[in-house]
């Protein structure tokens, strides 16, 4: 059973889907390396993992076949001056219409570029304002912290000065009392 399944898998790898379907209808084996059409023959030269190569053989034309037909171009009718003038006016109208369309597209493109530039400028201005506001706020906070630190230092110095004055007074009192 396993051998049959392996053989079936190998056959499936070798056959194309079209060959597989055809083998259901035509059980006799066919040469899958040669395909013939009305006026050409295709031979498979080699089959590799990287791709396939084919040889295309064109059959010579048979003497029975009809002579090649040449398509006759429609006869040009003589154009009157009015028809020529109408065609020229229509062409001029098309040219002007195309020019107007190109100008409209350019105007739309410039408008879009202007809008994008305006938006970028607004965003830049907003960013600058926000950065400036943050900087001012930070500077104010630093100033307040500095003033608070200075006030604390001054308070400590005054406290030390008061303590030193009290120590001196106590020493003087001690000297007076003992002396």
Curated annotation (Swiss-Prot):
Family: Belongs to the stathmin family.
GO molecular function per UniProt: calcium-dependent protein binding; tubulin binding
Signal sequence region: none
Coiled coil ranges: 75-179
Membrane association type: Peripheral membrane protein
Effect of residue 73 to D: Increased microtubule stability but no effect on neurite length
Main localization (coarse): cytoplasm
Pfam families in the record: Stathmin
Protein name: Stathmin-2
Positions of modified residues (Phosphoserine): 16, 50, 62, 73, 80, 97
Spans annotated as Membrane attachment: 1-26
Record-linked InterPro entries: Stathmin_CS, Stathmin_fam, Stathmin_sf
Outcome following mutation: residue 62 to A: Partial loss of phosphorylation. Complete loss of phosphorylation by MAPK8, increased microtubule solubility, and reduced neurite length
Regulatory/phosphorylation domain: annotated span: 39-96
Lipid anchor positions (S-palmitoyl cysteine): 22, 24
Role played: Regulator of microtubule stability. When phosphorylated by MAPK8, stabilizes microtubules and consequently controls neurite length in cortical neurons. In the developing brain, negatively regulates the rate of exit from multipolar stage and retards radial migration from the ventricular zone.
PTM characteristics: Sumoylated. Phosphorylated by MAPK9 and MAPK10 in the developing brain cortex. Phosphorylated mostly by MAPK8.
Keyword Coiled coil carried by entry: yes
UniProt source species: Rattus norvegicus
